[in-house]
Amino acid sequence: MTANSPIHVYSEIGKLKKVMLHRPGKEIENLMPDYLERLLFDDIPFLENAQKEHDAFAEALRNEGIEVLYLEKLAAESLINEEVRTAFIDEYIAEANIRGRATKEAIRNMLMSIEDNQELIDKTMAGIQKSELPEISDEEKGLTDLVESDYPFAIDPMPNLYFTRDPFATIGAGVSLNHMFSETRNRETLYGKYIFTHHPEYGGKVPMVYDRSENTRIEGGDELVLSKDVLAVGISQRTDAASIEKLLVNIFKQNLGFKKVLAFEFANNRKFMHLDTVFTMVDYDKFTIHPEIEGDLRVYSVTYENDKLKIVEEKGDLAELLAANLGVEKVELIRCGGDNIVAAGREQWNDGSNTLTIAPGVVVVYNRNTITNAILESKGLRLVKIEGSELVRGRGGPRCMSMPFEREDI
């Protein structure tokens, strides 16, 4: 294990001490109906109310004694000098795939003219409309500029940023800086790169177990830390098996303390985009699960022996498998929506299974999932309920919207 790392996350349920969020910003107001699919949204949240809901989420965490960090502030603090700042701007522009030379130059001039680091970061997150740039003559435009003349953005917004779980994942004392499923979201990982390279507190101090330069895809919603010995990973719409193999080899080689990984293979669709949308740990011996995945679920145990991954498909009951790997007598799987197929489908769509555990048996949930919440309370769990009518439009819940930096050991 790495004693000097400022990251310490060896479970899903240990008391949460420090967490990173992103307050939704102007990037949400750059959503428009014609391009929702391109930006991985199904609807457009009302920003003012989404911010109120997110502020209440952050305050609920603070009321539980949790220190709240913000991605946008950490990113701004990472631009520690002019050289780093310029490198960030150039890398941001390069990853936006702007092909028109004149357009690229105009964007660079705009960003370089922003003196305040926080304002710069916020602008890169919000995206840049073509109307914000000086008029460029047809002679100076590249072919892409002319072909996409009706498209309103010179650089797309990043509206998914408030789902901080996905661009990178904290695992033990390390971090997985992910290569994401879509080009739209993959640009988000640039902020993590600069935080873990240059930030005064985190830069160069956290072991990397996966790098964003890889060409296979993995996202944080598919990376769960069940205990100091066992990880769970999802093979899903957003994460492929090749990435998981790379991640696990790095984790085992860097001796972060983990002995086994359970790999969950389940339906590949947007409804079940990540493992944590259908399966989360809420107590020492309790998990939420969406009943629709149970029939087709396949689980593989992965260990590392003689410098090779050893992979075995597990057969039998999931609850028994989890109990054996967690060292508890029995595990209870709490089904989202109970036994009602309509309620289960509705509440899973509204992230009833996507809970954030902030201490053993203490769980942050959306208040709208009344059936699932009543079941959780009947099992003895204490729920911290938050409003999410606007936040949920992005298809993510409390776990999706949070990245733990520090938890107490269990």
Curated annotation (Swiss-Prot):
SUPFAM superfamilies: Pentein. It comes from the Bacteria. InterPro entries: Arg_deiminase. Gene3D superfamilies: Arginine deiminase (1.10.3930.10), L-arginine/glycine Amidinotransferase, Chain A (3.75.10.10). Its main location: cytoplasm. Keywords: Arginine metabolism, Cytoplasm, Hydrolase. Its EC number is 3.5.3.6. It catalyses: L-arginine + H2O = L-citrulline + NH4(+). Disulfide bonds: none annotated. GO terms for cellular component: cytoplasm. It is found in: Cytoplasm. Transmembrane segments: none annotated. Belongs to the arginine deiminase family. This is Arginine deiminase.
